[in-house]
Amino acid sequence: MSPVASTCLLCEMRTVVWGWQPAVPQPWHFVRFASSARLARRKPARMALSPNVARSSDRFKDSKKKKPPPTFKNNPFGGMNQTRARLPDRPIPRSDAELKRSSSDLNNKEKDAADKKQDGSLFRALKMQIALSPIPYSRRNRIKEKIAAVTSFDQFPLLPQVREAVYANAFPTLTEISPTPIQRVAIPALLRPPISETEKNKRKKKPQEEEEEELFHFDQFLLAAETGTGKTLAYLLPIINWIKQAEMVEKDTELMDNGEKQQGVTEKSKENLFELEAPELATPEHSNVARPRAIILVPTAELVEQVGKLAKQLSHTAKFRSATISSVYTPRRITNSLFNPAGIDILISTPHLLTSIAKTNPYILSRVAHLVIDEADSLLDKSFSPLTYSIMEKTAPSLTQLILCSATIPRSLDSVMEKKFPEMKRLVTPNLHAIPRRVQLGVVDVDKDPSRGNKKLACADIIWSLGKAGEVAAFLSQKGIHTAALSRDTPDQRKDEILAEFTHVKPLPTPQEVKDAQRNKRNWFSDPVPFATGENSHLGPQRNLRDTKVLVTTDLGSRGIDTVAVRNVILFDVPHTTIDFIHRLGRTGRMGRRGRGIVLVSKKDRKDVVKEVREAMFRGQALI
Protein backbone atom coordinates (compact mmCIF):
# COMPACT_ATOMS: atom_id res chain seq x y z
CA MET A 1 0.00 0.00 0.00
CA SER A 2 1.35 3.42 -0.98
CA PRO A 3 1.60 6.28 1.54
CA VAL A 4 -1.01 8.30 -0.42
CA ALA A 5 -3.55 5.52 -0.17
CA SER A 6 -3.13 5.55 3.58
CA THR A 7 -4.05 9.32 4.00
CA CYS A 8 -7.49 10.65 4.72
CA LEU A 9 -9.88 12.20 2.15
CA LEU A 10 -9.38 15.83 3.32
CA CYS A 11 -5.61 15.64 2.95
CA GLU A 12 -5.97 14.13 -0.48
CA MET A 13 -8.16 17.06 -1.65
CA ARG A 14 -5.59 19.55 -0.35
CA THR A 15 -2.94 17.79 -2.34
CA VAL A 16 -4.95 18.10 -5.51
CA VAL A 17 -5.93 21.80 -4.98
CA TRP A 18 -2.77 23.35 -3.51
CA GLY A 19 -0.14 20.73 -4.34
CA TRP A 20 0.67 20.14 -0.69
CA GLN A 21 2.58 16.96 0.13
CA PRO A 22 1.90 15.30 3.48
CA ALA A 23 4.64 14.48 5.85
CA VAL A 24 6.26 11.07 6.10
CA PRO A 25 3.67 8.63 7.44
CA GLN A 26 4.09 7.70 11.07
CA PRO A 27 4.03 4.14 12.49
CA TRP A 28 0.62 4.75 13.94
CA HIS A 29 -0.70 5.12 10.45
CA PHE A 30 0.16 1.46 9.67
CA VAL A 31 -1.17 0.27 13.00
CA ARG A 32 -4.36 2.15 12.43
CA PHE A 33 -4.85 0.58 9.00
CA ALA A 34 -3.50 -2.94 9.87
CA SER A 35 -6.58 -4.63 8.45
CA SER A 36 -5.97 -2.98 5.10
CA ALA A 37 -2.27 -3.86 5.21
CA ARG A 38 -3.05 -7.56 5.78
CA LEU A 39 -4.98 -7.66 2.53
CA ALA A 40 -2.10 -6.17 0.57
CA ARG A 41 0.50 -8.72 1.71
CA ARG A 42 2.18 -11.06 -0.75
CA LYS A 43 0.48 -14.39 -1.20
CA PRO A 44 2.42 -17.44 0.03
CA ALA A 45 4.23 -19.57 -2.51
CA ARG A 46 1.98 -22.58 -1.93
CA MET A 47 -0.97 -20.58 -3.24
CA ALA A 48 0.79 -19.31 -6.36
CA LEU A 49 0.98 -21.41 -9.51
CA SER A 50 4.10 -21.67 -11.59
CA PRO A 51 4.07 -19.70 -14.84
CA ASN A 52 5.06 -22.91 -16.62
CA VAL A 53 2.08 -24.87 -15.36
CA ALA A 54 0.42 -24.97 -18.76
CA ARG A 55 3.55 -26.13 -20.57
CA SER A 56 4.04 -29.87 -21.16
CA SER A 57 7.16 -31.57 -19.83
CA ASP A 58 9.53 -33.47 -22.09
CA ARG A 59 9.65 -36.31 -19.58
CA PHE A 60 5.91 -36.99 -19.93
CA LYS A 61 5.50 -36.35 -23.65
CA ASP A 62 5.21 -40.05 -24.42
CA SER A 63 3.58 -41.03 -21.11
CA LYS A 64 0.58 -42.52 -22.87
CA LYS A 65 2.72 -44.59 -25.20
CA LYS A 66 5.49 -45.70 -22.81
CA LYS A 67 5.35 -46.38 -19.07
CA PRO A 68 8.09 -45.10 -16.83
CA PRO A 69 10.87 -47.64 -16.12
CA PRO A 70 10.28 -49.57 -12.90
CA THR A 71 12.53 -48.76 -9.98
CA PHE A 72 13.79 -51.70 -7.95
CA LYS A 73 14.95 -50.70 -4.51
CA ASN A 74 16.24 -53.03 -1.82
CA ASN A 75 14.64 -51.40 1.16
CA PRO A 76 11.85 -52.32 3.56
CA PHE A 77 9.28 -50.64 1.30
CA GLY A 78 10.68 -51.79 -2.06
CA GLY A 79 8.07 -54.48 -2.51
CA MET A 80 5.01 -52.27 -2.10
CA ASN A 81 2.58 -51.36 -4.90
CA GLN A 82 4.09 -53.75 -7.43
CA THR A 83 1.95 -54.71 -10.45
CA ARG A 84 4.29 -57.28 -11.98
CA ALA A 85 6.92 -59.71 -10.84
CA ARG A 86 10.41 -58.32 -10.62
CA LEU A 87 12.29 -60.70 -12.88
CA PRO A 88 15.24 -58.80 -14.32
CA ASP A 89 17.52 -60.33 -16.93
CA ARG A 90 20.53 -60.03 -14.68
CA PRO A 91 20.91 -59.71 -10.91
CA ILE A 92 20.62 -56.21 -9.58
CA PRO A 93 23.95 -54.96 -8.24
CA ARG A 94 23.94 -54.01 -4.60
CA SER A 95 25.83 -51.21 -2.99
CA ASP A 96 28.79 -51.73 -0.67
CA ALA A 97 26.79 -50.51 2.30
CA GLU A 98 24.06 -53.02 1.59
CA LEU A 99 26.54 -55.87 1.19
CA LYS A 100 28.21 -54.94 4.47
CA ARG A 101 24.87 -54.73 6.21
CA SER A 102 23.73 -58.14 4.94
CA SER A 103 27.03 -59.84 5.83
CA SER A 104 26.97 -58.39 9.33
CA ASP A 105 23.40 -59.57 9.75
CA LEU A 106 24.44 -63.06 8.64
CA ASN A 107 27.35 -63.13 11.06
CA ASN A 108 25.10 -61.98 13.86
CA LYS A 109 22.59 -64.68 13.02
CA GLU A 110 25.29 -67.35 13.03
CA LYS A 111 26.61 -66.06 16.34
CA ASP A 112 23.15 -65.99 17.82
CA ALA A 113 22.54 -69.53 16.61
CA ALA A 114 25.78 -70.71 18.23
CA ASP A 115 24.94 -68.98 21.48
CA LYS A 116 21.45 -70.40 21.32
CA LYS A 117 22.84 -73.89 20.92
CA GLN A 118 25.37 -73.50 23.70
CA ASP A 119 23.41 -71.68 26.35
CA GLY A 120 19.93 -72.86 25.51
CA SER A 121 17.47 -70.45 23.98
CA LEU A 122 14.75 -71.44 26.41
CA PHE A 123 16.85 -71.02 29.55
CA ARG A 124 15.34 -67.77 30.71
CA ALA A 125 14.27 -68.70 34.21
CA LEU A 126 17.31 -70.92 34.80
CA LYS A 127 19.69 -68.11 33.84
CA MET A 128 18.46 -66.20 36.88
CA GLN A 129 19.80 -68.94 39.17
CA ILE A 130 22.82 -70.42 37.40
CA ALA A 131 24.41 -73.05 39.64
CA LEU A 132 26.57 -75.19 37.33
CA SER A 133 29.87 -74.48 35.64
CA PRO A 134 29.35 -74.47 31.84
CA ILE A 135 31.20 -76.80 29.49
CA PRO A 136 31.43 -75.77 25.80
CA TYR A 137 29.77 -78.06 23.30
CA SER A 138 32.91 -77.99 21.15
CA ARG A 139 34.81 -79.73 23.95
CA ARG A 140 31.97 -82.20 24.41
CA ASN A 141 32.12 -83.11 20.73
CA ARG A 142 35.89 -83.60 20.83
CA ILE A 143 35.58 -85.95 23.80
CA LYS A 144 32.80 -87.86 22.06
CA GLU A 145 34.94 -88.40 18.96
CA LYS A 146 37.94 -89.42 21.05
CA ILE A 147 36.19 -92.16 23.01
CA ALA A 148 34.13 -93.53 20.12
CA ALA A 149 36.81 -96.11 19.23
CA VAL A 150 36.95 -97.63 22.75
CA THR A 151 34.43 -100.47 22.97
CA SER A 152 35.95 -103.02 25.37
CA PHE A 153 37.94 -103.26 28.61
CA ASP A 154 40.54 -105.26 26.69
CA GLN A 155 41.71 -102.03 25.06
CA PHE A 156 42.93 -100.67 28.42
CA PRO A 157 46.48 -101.52 29.61
CA LEU A 158 45.22 -103.38 32.69
CA LEU A 159 46.83 -106.41 34.31
CA PRO A 160 45.23 -109.75 33.40
CA GLN A 161 43.92 -110.39 36.92
CA VAL A 162 42.36 -106.92 37.09
CA ARG A 163 40.69 -107.35 33.70
CA GLU A 164 39.40 -110.76 34.74
CA ALA A 165 37.94 -109.27 37.93
CA VAL A 166 35.90 -106.83 35.84
CA TYR A 167 34.24 -109.57 33.80
CA ALA A 168 33.85 -112.07 36.65
CA ASN A 169 32.96 -109.89 39.63
CA ALA A 170 31.87 -106.41 38.54
CA PHE A 171 29.32 -107.58 35.93
CA PRO A 172 28.64 -111.24 36.65
CA THR A 173 25.13 -111.27 35.15
CA LEU A 174 25.87 -109.44 31.89
CA THR A 175 26.91 -111.16 28.68
CA GLU A 176 27.99 -108.09 26.69
CA ILE A 177 30.21 -105.78 28.73
CA SER A 178 31.51 -102.46 27.41
CA PRO A 179 32.94 -99.47 29.30
CA THR A 180 30.81 -96.41 29.91
CA PRO A 181 31.89 -92.95 28.64
CA ILE A 182 33.47 -91.92 31.96
CA GLN A 183 35.39 -95.21 32.10
CA ARG A 184 36.66 -94.68 28.56
CA VAL A 185 37.87 -91.21 29.50
CA ALA A 186 39.20 -91.81 33.02
CA ILE A 187 40.87 -95.24 33.02
CA PRO A 188 43.58 -94.46 30.41
CA ALA A 189 44.33 -91.12 32.08
CA LEU A 190 44.58 -92.54 35.61
CA LEU A 191 46.77 -95.50 34.72
CA ARG A 192 50.41 -94.77 35.46
CA PRO A 193 53.52 -96.81 36.43
CA PRO A 194 54.17 -97.19 40.17
CA ILE A 195 56.91 -95.29 41.95
CA SER A 196 59.28 -97.52 43.87
CA GLU A 197 60.40 -96.73 47.39
CA THR A 198 63.99 -96.25 46.24
CA GLU A 199 62.94 -93.59 43.75
CA LYS A 200 61.02 -91.79 46.49
CA ASN A 201 64.08 -91.80 48.74
CA LYS A 202 66.26 -90.42 45.93
CA ARG A 203 64.19 -87.26 45.70
CA LYS A 204 66.12 -84.28 46.93
CA LYS A 205 64.82 -82.67 50.05
CA LYS A 206 63.65 -79.14 49.35
CA PRO A 207 63.79 -76.18 51.69
CA GLN A 208 60.84 -75.62 53.97
CA GLU A 209 59.57 -72.63 51.98
CA GLU A 210 59.48 -74.58 48.72
CA GLU A 211 57.75 -77.49 50.45
CA GLU A 212 55.00 -75.18 51.66
CA GLU A 213 54.55 -73.71 48.19
CA GLU A 214 54.43 -77.16 46.55
CA LEU A 215 52.27 -78.81 49.17
CA PHE A 216 49.94 -80.23 46.51
CA HIS A 217 52.69 -81.40 44.14
CA PHE A 218 51.03 -84.53 42.77
CA ASP A 219 48.79 -85.59 39.91
CA GLN A 220 45.32 -84.09 40.22
CA PHE A 221 42.24 -85.33 38.36
CA LEU A 222 38.55 -84.51 38.38
CA LEU A 223 36.10 -87.20 37.24
CA ALA A 224 32.74 -85.67 36.32
CA ALA A 225 29.96 -87.67 34.69
CA GLU A 226 26.20 -88.01 34.86
CA THR A 227 24.66 -90.14 37.59
CA GLY A 228 24.65 -93.92 37.30
CA THR A 229 27.47 -94.28 34.75
CA GLY A 230 30.08 -96.22 36.76
CA LYS A 231 32.35 -93.53 38.21
CA THR A 232 33.29 -95.78 41.15
CA LEU A 233 34.66 -98.48 38.87
CA ALA A 234 36.39 -95.82 36.78
CA TYR A 235 38.71 -94.84 39.65
CA LEU A 236 38.87 -98.24 41.39
CA LEU A 237 40.37 -100.15 38.47
CA PRO A 238 43.43 -97.86 38.01
CA ILE A 239 44.06 -97.90 41.77
CA ILE A 240 43.87 -101.69 41.94
CA ASN A 241 46.11 -101.98 38.89
CA TRP A 242 48.65 -99.63 40.52
CA ILE A 243 48.58 -101.64 43.77
CA LYS A 244 49.26 -104.91 41.95
CA GLN A 245 52.13 -103.36 40.00
CA ALA A 246 53.59 -101.92 43.21
CA GLU A 247 53.38 -105.35 44.83
CA MET A 248 55.34 -106.84 41.94
CA VAL A 249 58.03 -104.16 42.27
CA GLU A 250 58.24 -104.64 46.03
CA LYS A 251 58.40 -108.39 45.61
CA ASP A 252 61.36 -108.14 43.25
CA THR A 253 63.08 -105.71 45.60
CA GLU A 254 62.43 -108.00 48.55
CA LEU A 255 63.89 -110.99 46.71
CA MET A 256 67.04 -109.03 45.94
CA ASP A 257 67.36 -107.91 49.55
CA ASN A 258 66.80 -111.42 50.85
CA GLY A 259 69.44 -112.77 48.48
CA GLU A 260 71.99 -110.23 49.65
CA LYS A 261 71.06 -110.90 53.27
CA GLN A 262 71.37 -114.66 52.84
CA GLN A 263 74.73 -114.25 51.18
CA GLY A 264 75.93 -112.14 54.10
CA VAL A 265 74.69 -114.69 56.62
CA THR A 266 76.47 -117.49 54.76
CA GLU A 267 79.77 -115.63 54.76
CA LYS A 268 79.37 -114.80 58.44
CA SER A 269 78.60 -118.41 59.32
CA LYS A 270 81.76 -119.53 57.56
CA GLU A 271 83.83 -117.17 59.67
CA ASN A 272 82.12 -118.07 62.97
CA LEU A 273 81.34 -121.76 62.72
CA PHE A 274 80.89 -122.31 66.47
CA GLU A 275 78.61 -119.31 67.25
CA LEU A 276 74.85 -119.81 67.63
CA GLU A 277 72.41 -117.28 66.14
CA ALA A 278 69.97 -115.80 68.67
CA PRO A 279 66.29 -116.46 67.86
CA GLU A 280 63.96 -113.58 67.06
CA LEU A 281 62.01 -112.41 70.09
CA ALA A 282 58.95 -111.34 68.05
CA THR A 283 57.76 -111.70 64.51
CA PRO A 284 58.26 -108.59 62.37
CA GLU A 285 55.12 -106.55 61.93
CA HIS A 286 53.55 -106.42 58.48
CA SER A 287 54.33 -103.23 56.58
CA ASN A 288 50.67 -102.73 55.64
CA VAL A 289 49.21 -102.87 59.16
CA ALA A 290 47.09 -99.71 59.56
CA ARG A 291 48.94 -98.17 56.61
CA PRO A 292 46.68 -98.24 53.54
CA ARG A 293 47.99 -97.47 50.09
CA ALA A 294 44.75 -95.79 48.95
CA ILE A 295 41.96 -93.99 50.82
CA ILE A 296 38.48 -93.31 49.46
CA LEU A 297 36.48 -90.62 51.25
CA VAL A 298 32.68 -90.56 50.93
CA PRO A 299 30.16 -88.34 52.76
CA THR A 300 27.77 -90.96 54.21
CA ALA A 301 27.86 -94.39 55.80
CA GLU A 302 25.56 -95.73 53.07
CA LEU A 303 28.15 -94.87 50.43
CA VAL A 304 30.86 -96.52 52.54
CA GLU A 305 28.92 -99.78 52.36
CA GLN A 306 28.27 -99.43 48.62
CA VAL A 307 31.86 -98.67 47.58
CA GLY A 308 33.21 -101.27 50.00
CA LYS A 309 30.93 -103.92 48.52
CA LEU A 310 32.25 -103.28 45.00
CA ALA A 311 35.87 -103.32 46.20
CA LYS A 312 35.25 -106.59 48.04
CA GLN A 313 33.80 -108.18 44.90
CA LEU A 314 36.83 -107.19 42.83
CA SER A 315 39.23 -108.46 45.51
CA HIS A 316 38.05 -112.07 45.05
CA THR A 317 39.87 -112.23 41.71
CA ALA A 318 42.40 -109.38 41.85
CA LYS A 319 43.61 -110.41 45.34
CA PHE A 320 43.99 -107.23 47.37
CA ARG A 321 42.85 -106.21 50.86
CA SER A 322 40.15 -103.61 51.45
CA ALA A 323 38.41 -102.36 54.59
CA THR A 324 35.45 -100.14 55.39
CA ILE A 325 34.90 -98.08 58.52
CA SER A 326 32.00 -95.81 59.43
CA SER A 327 30.20 -94.50 62.47
CA VAL A 328 27.65 -97.34 62.39
CA TYR A 329 30.37 -99.90 63.18
CA THR A 330 31.42 -100.83 66.70
CA PRO A 331 34.88 -99.76 67.93
CA ARG A 332 36.01 -103.40 68.03
CA ARG A 333 35.11 -103.92 64.37
CA ILE A 334 36.88 -100.70 63.35
CA THR A 335 40.02 -101.76 65.24
CA ASN A 336 40.02 -105.23 63.72
CA SER A 337 39.61 -103.80 60.21
CA LEU A 338 42.41 -101.25 60.52
CA PHE A 339 44.96 -103.25 62.51
CA ASN A 340 44.55 -106.54 60.70
CA PRO A 341 47.93 -108.36 60.73
CA ALA A 342 47.49 -109.18 57.04
CA GLY A 343 47.63 -105.48 56.23
CA ILE A 344 45.34 -103.20 54.23
CA ASP A 345 45.52 -101.79 50.71
CA ILE A 346 42.33 -99.73 50.24
CA LEU A 347 40.42 -98.00 53.03
CA ILE A 348 36.91 -96.56 52.54
CA SER A 349 35.77 -94.14 55.23
CA THR A 350 34.04 -90.86 56.03
CA PRO A 351 36.12 -87.73 56.74
CA HIS A 352 34.88 -87.35 60.34
CA LEU A 353 35.85 -90.83 61.45
CA LEU A 354 39.19 -90.89 59.63
CA THR A 355 40.18 -87.51 61.05
CA SER A 356 39.42 -88.60 64.61
CA ILE A 357 41.45 -91.81 64.16
CA ALA A 358 44.37 -89.92 62.57
CA LYS A 359 44.64 -87.69 65.66
CA THR A 360 45.51 -90.66 67.86
CA ASN A 361 47.26 -92.72 65.13
CA PRO A 362 48.90 -90.28 62.67
CA TYR A 363 50.93 -93.14 61.21
CA ILE A 364 47.81 -94.36 59.41
CA LEU A 365 48.20 -91.68 56.70
CA SER A 366 51.95 -92.08 56.15
CA ARG A 367 51.76 -94.52 53.24
CA VAL A 368 48.83 -93.21 51.20
CA ALA A 369 49.62 -92.92 47.49
CA HIS A 370 46.08 -92.44 46.14
CA LEU A 371 43.41 -90.24 47.71
CA VAL A 372 39.91 -90.31 46.23
CA ILE A 373 37.30 -87.74 47.26
CA ASP A 374 33.98 -89.10 46.07
CA GLU A 375 31.04 -86.67 45.87
CA ALA A 376 33.57 -83.82 45.84
CA ASP A 377 30.88 -81.15 45.57
CA SER A 378 29.73 -82.19 49.06
CA LEU A 379 33.10 -82.95 50.70
CA LEU A 380 34.62 -79.64 49.58
CA ASP A 381 31.79 -77.41 50.76
CA LYS A 382 31.83 -75.41 53.98
CA SER A 383 30.69 -78.27 56.23
CA PHE A 384 33.23 -80.92 55.14
CA SER A 385 36.12 -78.87 53.73
CA PRO A 386 38.14 -78.39 56.99
CA LEU A 387 38.26 -82.15 57.57
CA THR A 388 38.95 -82.96 53.92
CA TYR A 389 41.79 -80.44 53.63
CA SER A 390 43.39 -81.72 56.83
CA ILE A 391 43.50 -85.25 55.40
CA MET A 392 44.99 -83.87 52.16
CA GLU A 393 47.76 -82.08 54.04
CA LYS A 394 48.68 -85.14 56.09
CA THR A 395 48.82 -87.44 53.06
CA ALA A 396 50.59 -84.93 50.78
CA PRO A 397 54.21 -86.10 51.45
CA SER A 398 53.51 -89.61 50.12
CA LEU A 399 50.62 -88.81 47.77
CA THR A 400 51.08 -89.41 44.06
CA GLN A 401 47.51 -89.03 42.80
CA LEU A 402 44.49 -87.02 43.96
CA ILE A 403 41.13 -87.88 42.38
CA LEU A 404 37.99 -85.81 42.80
CA CYS A 405 34.75 -87.43 41.71
CA SER A 406 31.36 -85.78 41.23
CA ALA A 407 28.20 -85.95 39.15
CA THR A 408 28.08 -82.15 38.82
CA ILE A 409 30.54 -79.26 38.75
CA PRO A 410 28.89 -76.46 40.72
CA ARG A 411 30.27 -72.97 40.45
CA SER A 412 31.46 -73.20 44.05
CA LEU A 413 33.51 -76.32 43.28
CA ASP A 414 34.85 -74.68 40.12
CA SER A 415 36.13 -71.69 42.09
CA VAL A 416 37.72 -73.97 44.70
CA MET A 417 39.60 -75.92 42.02
CA GLU A 418 40.82 -72.75 40.30
CA LYS A 419 42.11 -71.44 43.63
CA LYS A 420 43.47 -74.60 45.30
CA PHE A 421 44.20 -76.90 42.34
CA PRO A 422 44.90 -74.81 39.24
CA GLU A 423 46.70 -77.72 37.52
CA MET A 424 43.86 -80.19 37.93
CA LYS A 425 42.95 -82.18 34.81
CA ARG A 426 39.23 -82.34 34.22
CA LEU A 427 37.98 -85.65 32.83
CA VAL A 428 34.37 -85.05 31.82
CA THR A 429 31.85 -86.87 29.63
CA PRO A 430 29.96 -85.44 26.65
CA ASN A 431 26.60 -85.56 28.48
CA LEU A 432 27.68 -83.97 31.75
CA HIS A 433 24.92 -81.95 33.49
CA ALA A 434 22.31 -83.51 31.21
CA ILE A 435 19.58 -85.74 32.59
CA PRO A 436 19.42 -88.89 30.42
CA ARG A 437 16.74 -88.84 27.75
CA ARG A 438 15.63 -92.30 28.82
CA VAL A 439 14.24 -90.61 31.95
CA GLN A 440 10.89 -88.93 31.41
CA LEU A 441 9.69 -86.11 33.63
CA GLY A 442 6.01 -85.66 34.44
CA VAL A 443 4.47 -82.66 36.17
CA VAL A 444 1.39 -82.87 38.41
CA ASP A 445 -0.35 -79.63 39.39
CA VAL A 446 -1.64 -80.30 42.89
CA ASP A 447 -3.87 -77.21 42.82
CA LYS A 448 -6.19 -78.89 40.32
CA ASP A 449 -8.61 -81.77 40.79
CA PRO A 450 -8.60 -84.25 42.41
CA SER A 451 -5.94 -83.23 44.95
CA ARG A 452 -6.94 -79.52 45.22
CA GLY A 453 -3.78 -78.41 46.96
CA ASN A 454 -3.23 -81.58 49.00
CA LYS A 455 0.25 -82.83 48.09
CA LYS A 456 -0.04 -85.94 50.25
CA LEU A 457 -3.20 -87.01 48.44
CA ALA A 458 -1.58 -86.37 45.05
CA CYS A 459 1.50 -88.41 46.03
CA ALA A 460 -0.63 -91.33 47.24
CA ASP A 461 -2.71 -91.25 44.05
CA ILE A 462 0.43 -91.41 41.90
CA ILE A 463 1.86 -94.35 43.84
CA TRP A 464 -1.46 -96.19 43.63
CA SER A 465 -1.66 -95.66 39.88
CA LEU A 466 1.86 -97.07 39.42
CA GLY A 467 0.92 -100.50 40.79
CA LYS A 468 -2.74 -100.53 39.85
CA ALA A 469 -2.31 -102.46 36.59
CA GLY A 470 -0.44 -105.28 38.30
CA GLU A 471 -2.95 -105.44 41.13
CA VAL A 472 -5.93 -105.72 38.76
CA ALA A 473 -4.14 -108.35 36.69
CA ALA A 474 -3.40 -110.41 39.81
CA PHE A 475 -7.04 -110.21 40.91
CA LEU A 476 -8.33 -111.38 37.53
CA SER A 477 -5.77 -114.19 37.43
CA GLN A 478 -7.03 -115.46 40.79
CA LYS A 479 -10.52 -115.68 39.28
CA GLY A 480 -9.36 -117.89 36.45
CA ILE A 481 -9.02 -115.20 33.79
CA HIS A 482 -5.85 -115.30 31.75
CA THR A 483 -4.52 -111.78 32.33
CA ALA A 484 -1.20 -110.03 31.83
CA ALA A 485 -0.25 -106.58 33.11
CA LEU A 486 1.41 -104.28 30.58
CA SER A 487 2.67 -100.87 31.67
CA ARG A 488 5.67 -98.64 31.24
CA ASP A 489 7.47 -100.40 34.08
CA THR A 490 7.21 -103.81 32.41
CA PRO A 491 10.64 -105.09 31.26
CA ASP A 492 11.24 -105.04 27.52
CA GLN A 493 11.60 -108.81 27.25
CA ARG A 494 8.36 -109.34 29.12
CA LYS A 495 6.61 -106.76 26.90
CA ASP A 496 7.50 -108.74 23.80
CA GLU A 497 6.16 -111.93 25.33
CA ILE A 498 2.89 -110.27 26.35
CA LEU A 499 2.32 -108.53 23.04
CA ALA A 500 3.09 -111.70 21.11
CA GLU A 501 -0.04 -113.29 22.55
CA PHE A 502 -2.19 -110.47 21.18
CA THR A 503 -0.42 -109.74 17.90
CA HIS A 504 0.02 -113.29 16.58
CA VAL A 505 -2.81 -115.64 15.57
CA LYS A 506 -2.67 -118.85 17.56
CA PRO A 507 -3.27 -122.23 15.91
CA LEU A 508 -6.55 -124.04 16.37
CA PRO A 509 -6.96 -125.65 19.80
CA THR A 510 -6.49 -129.35 20.24
CA PRO A 511 -9.39 -131.58 21.36
CA GLN A 512 -7.91 -131.80 24.84
CA GLU A 513 -7.76 -128.00 25.12
CA VAL A 514 -11.41 -127.80 24.01
CA LYS A 515 -12.45 -130.28 26.73
CA ASP A 516 -10.52 -128.34 29.38
CA ALA A 517 -12.14 -125.09 28.30
CA GLN A 518 -15.64 -126.62 28.46
CA ARG A 519 -14.95 -128.06 31.91
CA ASN A 520 -13.76 -124.68 33.19
CA LYS A 521 -16.85 -123.05 31.71
CA ARG A 522 -19.19 -125.46 33.54
CA ASN A 523 -17.38 -124.88 36.81
CA TRP A 524 -17.62 -121.14 36.28
CA PHE A 525 -21.39 -121.08 35.76
CA SER A 526 -21.99 -123.56 38.57
CA ASP A 527 -20.59 -121.06 41.06
CA PRO A 528 -23.47 -118.77 42.17
CA VAL A 529 -21.13 -115.88 42.98
CA PRO A 530 -18.04 -116.33 40.81
CA PHE A 531 -16.15 -113.25 42.04
CA ALA A 532 -16.86 -113.79 45.75
CA THR A 533 -13.85 -114.23 47.98
CA GLY A 534 -13.33 -115.68 51.39
CA GLU A 535 -12.90 -112.22 52.93
CA ASN A 536 -15.51 -110.76 55.23
CA SER A 537 -17.70 -108.28 53.45
CA HIS A 538 -17.87 -105.89 56.37
CA LEU A 539 -14.11 -105.38 56.31
CA GLY A 540 -14.25 -103.81 52.87
CA PRO A 541 -11.66 -104.16 50.12
CA GLN A 542 -8.05 -104.30 51.17
CA ARG A 543 -6.30 -101.52 49.26
CA ASN A 544 -2.70 -102.62 49.28
CA LEU A 545 0.00 -102.89 46.62
CA ARG A 546 1.99 -106.00 47.39
CA ASP A 547 4.49 -105.65 44.54
CA THR A 548 5.08 -101.92 44.96
CA LYS A 549 7.85 -100.84 47.33
CA VAL A 550 8.21 -97.19 48.28
CA LEU A 551 11.22 -95.54 49.93
CA VAL A 552 10.60 -92.13 51.49
CA THR A 553 13.92 -90.33 51.92
CA THR A 554 15.42 -86.88 52.24
CA ASP A 555 18.19 -85.40 50.13
CA LEU A 556 20.50 -87.88 51.88
CA GLY A 557 19.37 -90.62 49.53
CA SER A 558 20.01 -88.58 46.39
CA ARG A 559 23.81 -88.70 46.60
CA GLY A 560 25.66 -91.61 45.10
CA ILE A 561 23.33 -94.44 46.15
CA ASP A 562 23.20 -96.96 43.31
CA THR A 563 19.43 -97.45 43.19
CA VAL A 564 19.41 -99.64 40.09
CA ALA A 565 15.98 -101.16 40.79
CA VAL A 566 14.21 -97.80 41.10
CA ARG A 567 11.98 -96.98 38.14
CA ASN A 568 10.00 -94.01 39.46
CA VAL A 569 11.06 -90.97 41.49
CA ILE A 570 8.45 -88.61 42.95
CA LEU A 571 9.75 -85.15 43.87
CA PHE A 572 7.43 -84.05 46.66
CA ASP A 573 8.97 -80.56 46.62
CA VAL A 574 10.41 -78.74 43.62
CA PRO A 575 14.24 -78.72 43.88
CA HIS A 576 15.83 -75.35 44.54
CA THR A 577 18.66 -75.69 42.00
CA THR A 578 19.50 -77.68 38.90
CA ILE A 579 22.10 -79.55 40.98
CA ASP A 580 19.33 -81.07 43.09
CA PHE A 581 17.34 -81.84 39.95
CA ILE A 582 20.26 -83.84 38.52
CA HIS A 583 20.97 -85.77 41.71
CA ARG A 584 17.35 -86.56 42.61
CA LEU A 585 16.28 -87.61 39.13
CA GLY A 586 19.54 -89.53 38.89
CA ARG A 587 18.16 -92.17 41.28
CA THR A 588 16.38 -93.69 38.28
CA GLY A 589 17.51 -94.47 34.75
CA ARG A 590 20.89 -95.78 35.93
CA MET A 591 23.24 -97.83 33.73
CA GLY A 592 21.11 -97.45 30.61
CA ARG A 593 17.78 -98.34 32.21
CA ARG A 594 14.53 -96.46 31.74
CA GLY A 595 12.99 -94.31 34.43
CA ARG A 596 10.37 -91.73 35.18
CA GLY A 597 10.31 -88.68 37.41
CA ILE A 598 7.18 -86.92 38.67
CA VAL A 599 7.25 -83.41 40.16
CA LEU A 600 4.45 -82.09 42.35
CA VAL A 601 4.06 -78.35 41.74
CA SER A 602 1.76 -75.84 43.39
CA LYS A 603 1.04 -72.17 42.92
CA LYS A 604 3.96 -71.28 45.21
CA ASP A 605 6.55 -73.11 43.08
CA ARG A 606 8.49 -71.91 40.04
CA LYS A 607 6.61 -73.65 37.25
CA ASP A 608 8.72 -71.92 34.60
CA VAL A 609 11.87 -73.55 36.00
CA VAL A 610 10.25 -76.99 35.91
CA LYS A 611 9.09 -76.36 32.35
CA GLU A 612 12.59 -75.44 31.17
CA VAL A 613 14.12 -78.47 32.87
CA ARG A 614 11.55 -80.70 31.20
CA GLU A 615 12.22 -79.21 27.76
CA ALA A 616 15.98 -79.57 28.26
CA MET A 617 15.51 -83.23 29.15
CA PHE A 618 13.42 -83.77 26.02
CA ARG A 619 16.11 -82.16 23.83
CA GLY A 620 19.02 -83.81 25.61
CA GLN A 621 20.56 -80.46 26.57
CA ALA A 622 22.78 -79.85 29.57
CA LEU A 623 21.34 -77.84 32.44
CA ILE A 624 22.95 -74.63 33.64
UniProtKB/Swiss-Prot annotation:
Motif stretch (Q motif): 151-184
PROSITE patterns named in the record: HELICASE_ATP_BIND_1 (PS51192), HELICASE_CTER (PS51194), Q_MOTIF (PS51195)
Gene designation per UniProt: MRH4
Organism whose genome encodes this protein: Ajellomyces capsulatus (strain NAm1 / WU24)
Name the UniProt record assigns to this protein: ATP-dependent RNA helicase MRH4, mitochondrial
Gene3D superfamilies attached to this UniProt entry: P-loop containing nucleotide triphosphate hydrolases (3.40.50.300)
Top-level enzyme category: hydrolase
Lineage: Eukaryota, Fungi, Dikarya, Ascomycota, Pezizomycotina
Domain annotation Helicase ATP-binding: ranges: 212-427
Amino acids binding ATP: A225, E226, T227, G228, T229, G230, K231, T232
Motif mapping: DEAD box: 374-377
